[in-house]
Amino acid sequence: MALRNNTWTLGEWYDQTVAGTGSYYEDNTFWAWGDNQAGALGQNQATSVKVSSPTQVPGTTWSKIATGTGYNFHMAIKTNGSLWAWGQGGYGNLGQNAGPGGGTLYYSSPVQIPGTTWNKVCISQRHWLGIKTNAELWTCGSNQGGELGQNKADVPGQGDTTDNSYSSPIQIPGSWTDLGTGTNRSYGIKTDGTLWSWGSNSNGGPLGLNEASTSHSSPTQIHGGGTNWASLSTSHEKAMAAIKTDGTLWTWGRTTNYNLPSNSDRSSPIQVPGTNWAQVSGSYNSWWATKTDGTLWSWGGNDDGQLGHNNQNPSGISSPVQIGSNTNWSSVRAGLKMCFFRTTGNALFAVGQNTNGQLGNNSIDKVSSPVLIGTGAWSDVGGGYYTSFGIRQW
């Protein structure tokens, strides 16, 4: 583990520290914390231990962490565009052309997915989507609800088995710029700005197609929303959010604990109050978002204090409420009932559920207002069910 030494001046250590002499880690190192069930921390051990502070995963060329919320499996991209996966792979979701048919197969250290031009990836419980630098969209894992977009829920060949899984990546036609996943469902934005969804549509119409329950096993356009969709985020509990190029924020799907502004299920997109939204991330029944002015907002369920308002009101909040008064927030990334926030100086903060040490603050106590995580600057972060990951910038 390489260390560098330097002398810092006032303001160079995060956004808020003092002058002094410090050490920082080599660029692009990868760190993990939380529950190691099924080797989910990528530490080359399968023991189900809890790690409550960041611990390094081998390698120094990591670039991007998968978005979404995987259940005991995770993925990340290296600087050379290679894609890696680890953890539980019983549905073929680790892309190794092996494993469908159960939940016992796992890799406790990262294994490479074929290809070297991966640009972004989003994971769900048992499947994932990935976009390459040429805008191709690929997918792998469980196809139980048609979430792999192959026009069937059970497609023979190419690694598929009777449990509907693909154990090696398969392409979804079209040119794509962004992607999102949920339980047995998938979403994508094409290069023309149109929004598409496919997979299971049960529990509130989470596909956004103005249908209550009809599932779709191939990409279907969400009509009425125009051609100006910019970015996607998913919420684990059957809901979805997306931001348009005009800075408006839209949600739809199942409502729990006021996670939708109407407090009722919505099978088509409905606008969230406010403008100038920059980024949104959701999980289970809560949402967190940043605006272009650097402010941080949250709404939805709050039973673990995950909204960051220094309380644990279980009744939830139905519209966005600002977290604190700072204007230097740059990104949000949700895990299950928790969220990570980065500042413009790439300091890392976390809030919410922490029973497995997944916040990384050397504790297992829940946190109801943002707490600083680790040292150094972080270029990316990701949260799963009970595990979390980060890439150090220095």
What label would you give each PLM region?
Residues 1-27, 31-33, 392-394:
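Enriched but not universal
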Residues 69-70, 79, 123-125, 133, ...:
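Residue-level detector of Asp-centered blade-edge/turn motifs that repeat once per structural unit
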Residues 381-394:
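Blade-level signature of beta-propeller repeat domains, shared across WD40, Kelch, NHL, RCC1
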Residues 31-51, 87-108, 141-166, 198-217, ...:
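Short glycine/serine- and acidic-residue-enriched loop/turn motifs that recur at repeat junctions
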Residues 32, 72-76, 85, 127-130, ...:
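Conserved core positions of repeat-based scaffolds
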